């Protein structure tokens, strides 16, 4: 089989790799679509792992199972050849203290699990442990839509951390954020997903980005007003009568963006750090100003099974889809053009699709 191996942000190679060998309880998935993650655009993040087969936003079709061990998903369903699935690259044990408290990303099993070799390959081995966060795609949900489950799940978790009283841990419904104000900084695909989902929850949304076209997309998804970053603080203050935002999602991982986020978080509000700054870089702020406004600073890293389940539900309901986000599809092996289009911000979202093999034949290395 062929796989896209990332050696650096400007060095992606299509290489031959052997088919993964299935262990008891494992599943082999023929890829249908895999998204290019915004995180894989950060040089420091890529270089600490390279070389590696990247891609952790996958969806595909089960083509083989090793049923020496039970192939049961979290909801009790059994996987079978032909099932169309989303599979999370990390999955928790569901039994430790962290899992019982819903803090899945702090589960030791979650941090040790991975797909082999990665989503930008023609076939992927899903280890038995990862079945704890593997979901069967409903009819009508395309592979491109399925590849949005993981990034949207990160947004679900982010909004839960921004509004814990209103959204709780699972199953939040529309109108939960009626009367609440959200400010989204940065309108890449993750920022746009925040806008679309928060609008479905009934929030009043403001957003900012340097890119005027992205601001237009945000308004089409439900943002009430959008601003250029240079005018955002004053404009938000004017729009809210001085209250500023109940919650701010800071998308860019830069100290300057975080400073703007803090300045626009209202009294008793929450600033969500959605993207890390480069390790070793420092962010300083006026602690006194945050203290006397009762501002909460929280991080939101990745997601867990509660989030992926809700994300798939929102996708199936049409709240966030590949069509609504106007994603651009690139057929494998055009992985490097997909990556470069994302890096240059020429597209909102790049998704690599995998043309079907001959369904009448056994899967083979090609």
Predicted features and spans:
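C-terminal hydrophobic helical "lid"/dimerization subdomain
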Residues: 247, 259-263, 305-366
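Rossmann-fold NAD(P)-binding glycine/threonine-rich loop
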Residues: 276-293
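Short glycine-centered segments of the SAM/dcSAM-binding site in methyltransferase folds
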Residues: 84, 181, 269-270, 296
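NAD(P)H dinucleotide-binding glycine-rich loop of Rossmann-like/cofactor-binding domains
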Residues: 93-182
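Helix-to-beta-strand junctions that scaffold the AdoMet/dcAdoMet cofactor pocket
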Residues: 265-267
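Glycine-rich beta-strand-centered segment in the early N-terminal region that forms part
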Residues: 20-34, 47-97, 138
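N-terminal Rossmann-fold NAD(P) dinucleotide-binding loop
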Residues: 191-192
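Adenosine-nucleotide cofactor-binding segment
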Residues: 178-187, 197-260
